Amino acid sequence: MTLLIMITLTSISLLLAAAETIPTTLDGPFKPLTRRFEPSLRRGSDDLPMDHPRLRKRNVSSDFPEQIALALSTPTSMWVSWVTGDAIVGKDVKPLDPSSIASEVWYGKEKGNYMLKKKGNATVYSQLYPSDGLLNYTSGIIHHVLIDGLEPETRYYYRCGDSSVPAMSEEISFETLPLPSKDAYPHRIAFVGDLGLTSNTTTTIDHLMENDPSLVIIVGDLTYANQYRTIGGKGVPCFSCSFPDAPIRETYQPRWDAWGRFMEPLTSKVPTMVIEGNHEIEPQASGITFKSYSERFAVPASESGSNSNLYYSFDAGGVHFVMLGAYVDYNNTGLQYAWLKEDLSKVDRAVTPWLVATMHPPWYNSYSSHYQEFECMRQEMEELLYQYRVDIVFAGHVHAYERMNRIYNYTLDPCGPVYITIGDGGNIEKVDVDFADDPGKCHSSYDLFFFNSLNLSN
C-alpha cells in the first residue's frame, strides 16, 4: 500500500491521503503531531528475482535500445540515455567497444515525423574485484545524446538507437517543461527515494505513474545492488556476504540493468533527475567509487557550472533545484561549497521564486536510524541555504516520512526551510520505526511506502 502526499505551495499545505487534517506552516509553527505505528506490523518484501517479467531483457537483439531514460539539461534541451549490448559477468571480462554502434535520436512534434536528428556519445564501465569467488562485471554500451531546440510545454515524439543496423526503439513521447518563470510550473513533481527492486517498489512506482508527474526526482539509493540477495530474503544478507574473507564487498551489478528495465516505462517518458546515495558508492579495490552511477546517468553538471555529476542544479519552470552531494567533499573550503554559493547567488527569485534543495541524508531527523549522521554537513552548509532563503529541503535515507516546521540551527525560524524526509520507496531494508528520543516533535507517518508529489504555483 502506498501513501500519496500532495504539497500545494500556494498555501504551503500538506495533505495526507488519510482523512486527517495536518497543520500548515502558513500561520507559523504548529503543535507537532505523531502517529504511532505498531513495530510488529512492520512490512517489507524480498528482492524481485532477475527473471521477473519487469526486470529481464526483452529485446530479441542486443543492438536494440533498452533502459531508456530522459533527464533535463537546460530549459530547451534534454538528455536521452539508453543501453545496448550485453553486460558480461565473470572472472575475466573484456569490455565491449562503444564505437561499434551509433548513438542517434530522431525527434519531432508529430507522430512518425522526425524533423530533427542528433548524435551523441557512448561509453562502457567495469566493476572489478580482485578476490576469488567475486564476480567482475563490464557493462553494456551506455549511450547519451543531447537533443536541443525544444519548445516549452510541447509534446515531442522520438526514437533512439542506430539507424544503420537498423536498431531503433519504438516511438516514445515526452512533454517539455515550461520555461523559467514566476507564472509557469510543472503540473506535478514526484519525489521518491530508497527504491530498490521489491514488490513494494513496484507498488510505489505504479502509484507514482498513475499520478502523471511531469518531472521525477530520486533522492538517492536507487538499485540496492550492493545488498541484492540472490535467494530472495533468505540466507546471507547480501550477495558478497557469502565470501566473508574478501577484502571488499561486491555489488551485484546486473541489478543496475534490471533496475533500468524496470524503470523504463517511467524514465523514457518523464525526465528523471537523480542524486547519489550511500548505496551508490560501490567501492572497487582500486579506490574508484560511484562508477555505475556516474556512467549511467546524464545530469546537467557542466550546464550548471559543476565540475562533478555528484552535485548540480537545474530549473523547472518557476523552481530552481540544487542537488547536493553528501558523499563528496562538502566543507566550506571545498569545490562543492564554492559551486553552491556561486549557483545560489545567481538565482533570480523574480524568475524562479521557489528554491528547493535535495540530498540523500536528512540534516534533521527524529528517528534513531541515521540520527545526526550528517551533522557535519549541516554545520558546513546550512547557513548558506538559510542565507539564500531555500524554501524546502527534500531528503531520503531514513525510511520513514517526516516533515519539520521551518527551522534553522535547531531553532524555529520563519525564514528557515521546511525539511521533508520522503520515506521508504520500497527497498528490502523495510521502514524505520524507532525514535531517537520521545516522539511528538513532528508529524510522522511510517507504516507505508512513499513517494511525494509537489504541485507548484507562485
From Swiss-Prot:
Fe cation binds at D194, D221, Y224, H399. Its EC number is 3.1.3.2. It is an enzyme of class 3 (hydrolase). SUPFAM superfamilies: Metallo-dependent phosphatases, Purple acid phosphatase, N-terminal domain. It is found in: Secreted. Homodimer. Acid phosphatase activity with ATP, ADP, dATP, pyrophosphate, polyphosphate, phosphoserine and phosphothreonine. Low or no activity with phosphotyrosine, AMP and phytate. This is Purple acid phosphatase 23. Optimum pH is 5-6. It holds the Pfam family Metallophos. Specifically expressed in flowers. Belongs to the metallophosphoesterase superfamily. Purple acid phosphatase family. The lineage of its organism: Eukaryota, Viridiplantae, Streptophyta, Embryophyta, Tracheophyta. Its cofactor is Fe cation; Mn(2+).
